[in-house]
C-alpha cells in the first residue's frame, strides 16, 4: 500500500525536487559571487567593525532573497525577536499595524500588545487591527480596503498557517494581496513573516513586492546551523 501511495505522489515529489535544486543553485551562485571562503567561517561575537563573516553572510542573504540588504547576526536570537525588531524599527507612536492574514503567531501577541506585556508596541502608542482570511483561506480584499485608514503604517502578512487550520499562503497569492494594498496606498510598508516559507517555492515574497521579509535560522534557512 505504501509503495502505491508513493507512486501516486511521484509527480509531486519531482516538482519538490526541482524546486530544491533551483534554490540550491541560487544559493551556490550567491556563495560564488560573494566569494564565501574559510576566512568567513571563523567564530565571532557579531560585534565590532570589519566583521568580514557577518558582512559576507548578510550580502549573501540579500542576494539570495532579492532584497536591498539583510540582517543576519547572532544578536537576533529567534524568529519572534526578528519580527519584533522589524516592527519596532518601522513603527512610531500613533501608527497602526494591520494584520491581513488573521491573528499572528502566539509568540507575537505580547510583542504587539494583543496580550498585555511590558514594553509592547501597544504600550508605546502603536495600535493593532486585524482582518481575518475568508472561509476558503483567501484574503478578504473588501475587509482590507475598509480597514486601511490614515493611521495604517504597516501591513503584516503571515505566510505559514502556524497553529491555525487555514492553508499556507503561496507567494503568488501574497503578491496579489500586496499589489492590492499598494494600489490603495503605495507608501504602506508590507512585512511578510516568512518563517517556514523559505526555499519551498521558486521565488520569495520579496520578489512580488514585499518591503520586508522576516525569517528564522531555526527553520528552513538554518539547515545544520542550530545546535542540538
Regions found by a protein language model. Give the residues of each.
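Conserved PLP-enzyme active-site core in the AAT-like
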Residues: 1-6, 10-12, 27-28, 32-33, ...
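Acidic, PIN/NYN-like endoribonuclease modules and their adjacent C-terminal/linker elements
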Residues: 19-24
Amino acid at each position: 500500500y505504501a509503495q502505491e501511495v508513493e507512486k501516486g505522489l511521484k509527480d509531486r515529489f519531482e516538482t519538490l525536487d526541482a524546486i530544491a535544486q533551483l534554490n540550491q543553485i541560487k544559493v551556490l551562485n550567491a556563495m560564488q559571487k560573494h566569494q564565501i571562503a574559510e576566512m568567513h567561517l571563523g567564530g565571532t561575537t557579531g560585534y565590532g567593525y570589519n566583521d568580514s563573516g557577518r558582512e559576507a553572510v548578510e550580502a549573501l542573504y540579500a542576494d539570495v532573497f532579492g532584497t536591498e540588504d539583510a540582517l543576519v547576526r547572532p544578536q537576533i536570537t529567534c524568529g519572534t525577536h526578528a519580527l519584533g525588531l522589524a516592527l519596532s524599527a518601522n513603527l512610531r507612536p500613533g501608527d497602526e499595524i494591520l494584520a491581513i492574514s488573521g491573528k499572528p503567531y502566539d509568540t507575537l501577541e505580547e510583542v504587539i500588545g494583543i496580550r498585555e506585556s511590558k514594553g509592547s508596541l501597544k504600550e508605546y502608542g502603536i495600535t493593532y487591527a486585524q482582518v481575518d482570511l475568508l472561509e476558503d483561506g483567501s484574503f478578504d480584499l473588501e475587509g482590507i480596503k475598509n480597514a486601511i485608514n490614515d493611521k495604517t503604517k504597516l501591513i503584516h502578512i503571515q505566510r505559514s498557517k502556524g497553529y491555525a487550520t487555514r492553508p499556507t499562503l503561496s507567494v503568488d497569492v501574497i503578491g496579489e494581496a500586496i499589489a492590492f494594498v499598494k494600489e490603495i496606498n503605495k507608501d504602506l510598508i508590507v512585512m511578510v513573516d516568512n518563517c517556514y516559507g523559505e526555499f519551498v517555492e521558486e521565488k520569495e515574497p520579496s520578489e512580488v513586492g514585499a518591503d520586508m521579509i522576516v525569517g528564522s535560522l531555526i527553520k528552513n534557512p538554518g539547515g545544520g546551523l542550530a545546535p542540538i
